[in-house]
């Protein structure tokens, strides 16, 4: 490249002039420099000039005359654009010189134009007082620096002067010892601390984001640290968040909770019986605390009061009473129409049970006097009217039902203790039962009444069951149902009812150990060993449940008299095997009752009903009798064994039902099985009593 340039320089006639002009115009990078260089043919001038940036060349050309400059630029640049591939970098003169060669081929045609341009450049240089010969050397730098084209100074000079002088080995990117100091990765490199320190301030000065309002949402403000007034809290949260201990403030929220089975217990408490809740939970010990129960216990005035007393005295009923106190109040009258009540009350019980119970039980206790009993007897027909008012009470009962369930487990133990005095409680019941026996309808209305007297209660229950049966299928089905349903129908009617059935079953099972068990089954509140007999109650309850089932069936509208009940009994039997298999599924039968009615039609004449007997149906006592006779040890041994016994026995009768009837219950029970699990959560506490029953049975 240098040789070619030299040749060009020697060949060009305008060596120095063109050289000067070339050096002047050569400052343009590739295109401009090469064009002017080739045109001028200035060898020495073209080389340094070509190293200069294009900017210099452009400035020079602008200085040159317009015509020559435009022609020169058009030719050189167009060619440069075409042949620009030869030019690799702005800093290498060799490439620029190549460009010159390429252009030099065309120089002949261009020389004229370029010579004009060079002349113009020379004239401009002369105007500046620079000599052409000097233009190759210092003149170029001086002149261009004066022109503002300092960059035209040869890159070599620039690099030689600036690069080596100012760049250290670690600062020269071309030097292997170069230390990068910029970039995220090197910002913490301590090897060049002095410069890094200099650079860091710059970075510090920059703020990529603003923190001014960053913590406004969570800022500590002294004026906000003082406790807020109640008005402020209510304005902020809608209620006083600090009053969790204050039932008045929280009632609305707690009232919402009772939607669930167990919450109903809480709900009634929230409704205004928090103390009564504790009383209910106290169960047997809480006889006094449940004011309504206390009134009824003290009053012992009526069958209803008896049933309430049972809850009181029975401790079993205690929990139950808790769930049934209102039931007693509005329900004793409604008990005659208990079936309807159960349906409506079970639903409303949970809602109203606690509040209703508290208010209604107390007045009911006095009202429950023997007159109320008689009332119940008379109300058996008039149960429907009573049912309407009791429905609210029963709703309370509903709540208390789940509560009763829970308290029952607790109460079951206490009730066992207290109910080992069940004869006395039953004595109380007996006292009430004596009059109650007079109005079996009343007893029917008060499904709890059967528990009144163990023996008398059983007989009365049988009679009442008969009456209830009679009344039941007709118009009192609701009343008897409540009694029988009490364990079963209530559960049937209310979703949570089945779990209560276990409670009743427990009560029944507890009483099943004794002659009064059946009546106690009906009047679960009195059951002496409420919890342990759970299985017994389930076992007998299965037989009894048939009655209950029948009750529910009647409730469902199976007003058919004992025969359908028998069918129900059979189905209950069929169901019983399932309960035997699934003691806690005995509640499952509850849902089955609705399903059972069809099976009832199938099994009414079948042997199972015979074994269970229509009496079994209408007389839970009969069932108890059957259970007790069938299982003399059923009371004690029955609890665990009875499930097997009941199951096989039920199967024996099921041989009859073993055909379609058995399948129907099985299928039905399959459906109940889901429901038993639902109930099971509440009766979970009841399961242990069955084990106790097993131990008792084994003993």
Curated annotation (Swiss-Prot):
Tissue expression as described in the entry: Expressed in the brain, including in the hippocampus (at protein level).
Q: Which Pfam families match?
A: Btz
The annotated region (Disordered) lies at: 1-455, 577-596, 629-699
**Basic and acidic residues compositional bias, start-end:** 107-117, 124-135, 155-175, 208-231, 242-252, 338-352, 410-419
- The residue ranges flagged as biased composition, category Acidic residues, are 73-83, 92-106
Locations listed in the record: Cytoplasm; Cytoplasm, Perinuclear region; Nucleus; Nucleus speckle
**What protein am I looking at?**
Protein CASC3
Coiled-coil features, chain-numbered ranges: 93-128
Q: Where is this motif: Nuclear export signal?
A: 458-467
Q: Where is this motif: Nuclear localization signal 1?
A: 201-207
What positions carry the motif Nuclear localization signal 2? Answer: 251-259
Instruction: Point to the regions of Gly residues compositional bias.
Output: 29-45
In the record, the note on similarity to other proteins reads: Belongs to the CASC3 family.
Gene Ontology annotations of biological process type = intracellular mRNA localization; mRNA splicing, via spliceosome; mRNA transport; nuclear-transcribed mRNA catabolic process, nonsense-mediated decay; regulation of nuclear-transcribed mRNA catabolic process, nonsense-mediated decay; regulation of translation
Q: Where is this region: Sufficient to form the EJC?
A: 134-280
User: Where Phosphothreonine occurs along the chain?
Assistant: 354
Q: Which UniProt keywords apply?
A: ADP-ribosylation, Cell projection, Coiled coil, Cytoplasm, mRNA processing, mRNA splicing, mRNA transport, Nonsense-mediated mRNA decay, Nucleus, Phosphoprotein, RNA-binding, Spliceosome, Stress response, Translation regulation, Transport, Ubl conjugation
Regarding domains, what does the record say? The coiled coil domain may be involved in oligomerization.
User: What PANTHER family does its record include?
Assistant: PROTEIN CASC3 (PTHR13434:SF0)
Reported modifications of this chain? Phosphorylated. ADP-ribosylated by tankyrase TNKS and TNKS2. Poly-ADP-ribosylated protein is recognized by RNF146, followed by ubiquitination.
